From Swiss-Prot:
Cupin type-1 domain segment(s): 182-340, 386-566
Gene3D superfamilies on file: 6.10.250.890, Jelly Rolls
Record SUPFAM superfamilies: RmlC-like cupins
GO molecular function: nutrient reservoir activity
UniProt entry keywords in alphabetical sequence: Seed storage protein, Signal, Storage protein, Vacuole
Protein name: Vicilin C72
Main location: other
Any matching Pfam family: Vicilin_N
Subcellular location per the Swiss-Prot or TrEMBL entry: Vacuole, Aleurone grain; Vacuole
Length: 588
């Protein structure tokens, strides 16, 4: 009787416990509390495994947990309150804010996210403690801890955040470059003729990056690359052009309405080709590419230029084929069949030499094309060409050289108002900070690696080329508020990159520690600016302009004694223009 009574008591207690578990599953004190339904669902389900008897009772318990927490779990994963989604949305909102407010906004997002990470770590510790207190068997305890770790330390959004944090370490430097309107990566060029034997590519318009470059938007820059033993088809262009050879050797021939000019070209040779002149080229070398930077000043559309090919097949076509036969036959005094043969060509011959802008040529043909060519010297009396590197460097010492040809000195450049320059920096050397008073320089990296640092006012972001009047007024007001505030623009430079230095923006170029840096540049002027007397003003080095200030001006400007100003700005009496980073580090 006593045994039966005891059994009844045990049975009643078990039923009561099961009923209480089913009714209070949602109130089970899980490891995270009310703000984590997914975890509470896991706690509830695991409790069903521990405290229920029989498979049916366990299934009923788990169904109750699922009905209370399972749906919430799925909703939570797609709700914007999810930490990772909330962080991403926060960052996205920051990107839409003004540039000056963006860093503070991003910092707030990061701080909030880090607080949630700390909370997650605390919850993991609580979960782990719960496992040690509730689980008795070692295998269950290990399983419990493993589930805690998966929930709080190895979840996907935490791993994404860690990867994002690694990216943010380099984002500060890369962000300037990615949003830098003055740095044109070599991929900024668009190929017009990309063929087996060569490539002709054009840089995007300068003002497409930012309105501050509108002053030089009438110029376009292109790069012509011809493979060894390659001929470039004759063509003329609706633009005034300057050819600047940066690599290889070849022959450049062009015909004006009066004369034929032919030049042997090597790095440093500058050739001025008037608009409408028919020009063709040949790469004389058997191994190296002939690479030429071509500056265009269009005469029709200031934003666009076109090439016209008298001979061609498909791409490019001969522009003569656009005329009707009723015009061509009497104009050339020839039969229609001969015209078909001329413009169609022999199929086998076309297949052998190619059909594009660039044609493979024999060495005999290349030599014949260069027989009448002359080699430009410094000025050499040539009407249209000279070699920039044959003249005396404007600045030079053991760390570098700078060559320059200005419109007032070279008649080849006077009517187009362009300065041509070349910079050679030895490894580990610096072209000291300076600025140009009138010229905006477009610099092309020809060889080596390095970087550029430039001081820029805080400029508004470019929204569109044609801006609304209201946007312009807002930008003008913002510029006035930020007057006298600057930011550093730093860009890594490698072969093929373009960097634009606006007039009066202080700038410095630095060669890498293990490579020389070789660059060429075009100094461009706004059409309303007289290019004469552009001044390059140095702010460091032996001839920096601060040395010439009055003592009182130095003291009032810097707020220290003029002696200290002189000590700093006169501290490099032997070096001008170029200095070595190695020597400065050795003195430290």
């Amino acid at each position: 009787m006593v045994r039966n009574k005891s059994a009844c008591v045990v049975l009643l207690f078990s039923l009561f416990l099961s009923f209480g578990l089913l009714c209070s599953a949602k109130d089970f004190p899980g490891r995270r509390g009310d703000d984590d339904p997914p975890k509470r669902y896991e706690d509830c389900r695991r409790r069903c495994e521990w405290d229920t008897r029989g498979q049916k009772e366990q299934q009923q318990c788990e169904e109750s947990c699922k009905s209370q927490y399972g749906e919430k779990d799925q909703q939570q994963r797609h709700r914007p309150e999810d930490p990772q989604r909330r962080y991403e949305e926060c960052q996205q909102e920051c990107r839409q804010q003004e540039e000056r407010q963006r860093p503070q906004c991003q910092q707030r997002c990061l701080k909030r996210f880090e607080q949630e990470q700390q909370q997650s770590q605390r919850q993991f510790q609580e979960c782990q403690q719960h496992c040690h207190q509730q689980e008795q068997r070692p295998e269950r305890k290990q399983q419990c801890v493993r589930e805690c770790r998966e929930r709080y330390q190895e979840n996907p959004w935490r791993r994404e955040r860690e990867e994002e944090a690694e990216e943010e370490e380099t984002e500060e430097g890369e962000q300037e470059q990615s949003h830098n309107p003055f740095h044109f990566h070599r991929r900024s060029f668009q190929s017009r003729f990309r063929e087996e034997h060569g490539n002709f590519r054009v840089l995007q318009r300068f003002a497409s990056r930012h309105p501050i470059l509108r002053g030089i938007n009438e110029f376009r820059l292109s790069i012509l690359e011809a493979n060894p033993n390659t001929f470039v088809l004759p063509h003329h262009c609706d633009a005034e052009k300057i050819y600047l050879v940066t690599n290889g050797r070849g022959t450049l021939t062009f015909l004006t309405h009066e004369n034929k000019e032919s030049y042997n070209v090597v790095p440093g040779v500058v050739v001025r080709v008037p608009a409408g002149s028919t020009v063709y080229l040949a790469n004389q070398d058997n191994k190296e590419k002939l690479i030429i930077a071509v500056l265009h000043r269009p005469v029709n559309n200031p934003r666009q230029f076109e090439e016209f090919f008298p001979a061609g097949s498909q791409r490019p076509q001969s522009y003569l084929r656009a005329f009707s036969r009723e015009i061509l036959e009497p104009a050339f005094n020839t039969r229609s069949e001969q015209l078909d043969e001329l413009f169609g060509g022999r199929q086998s011959h076309r297949r052998q030499q190619g059909q594009g802008m660039f044609r493979k040529a024999s060495q005999e043909q290349i030599r014949a094309l260069s027989q009448e060519a002359t080699s430009p010297r410094e000025k050499s009396g040539e009407r249209f060409a000279f070699n920039l590197l044959y003249r005396t460097p404007r600045y030079s010492n053991q760390n570098g050289r700078f060559y320059e040809a200005c419109p007032r000195e070279f008649r080849q450049l006077s009517d187009i108002n362009v300065t041509v320059s070349a910079l050679q920096l030895n490894q580990g050397s610096i072209f000291v900070p300076h600025y140009n008073s009138k010229a905006t320089f477009v610099v092309l990296v020809n060889e080596g690696n390095g970087y550029v640092e430039m001081v820029s006012p805080h400029l508004p972001r470019q929204s569109s080329f044609e801006e609304e009047e209201e946007q312009q007024q807002e930008q003008e007001q913002e510029e006035e508020r930020r007057s006298g505030q600057y930011r550093k623009i730093r860009s890594q430079l490698s072969r093929g990159d373009i960097f634009v230095v606006p007039a009066n923006f202080p700038v410095t170029f630095v060669a890498s520690q293990n490579q020389n840096l070789r660059m060429t540049g075009f100094g461009l002027y706004n059409q309303n600016i007289n290019p004469d007397h552009n001044q390059r003003i140095f702010v460091a080095g032996k001839i920096n302009h601060v040395r010439q200030w009055d003592s009182q001006a130095k003291e009032l400007a810097f707020g220290v004694s003029s002696r200290l100003v002189d000590e700093i700005f006169n501290n490099n009496p032997q070096e001008s223009y170029f200095v070595s980073r190695q020597r400065q580090r050795a003195s430290e």
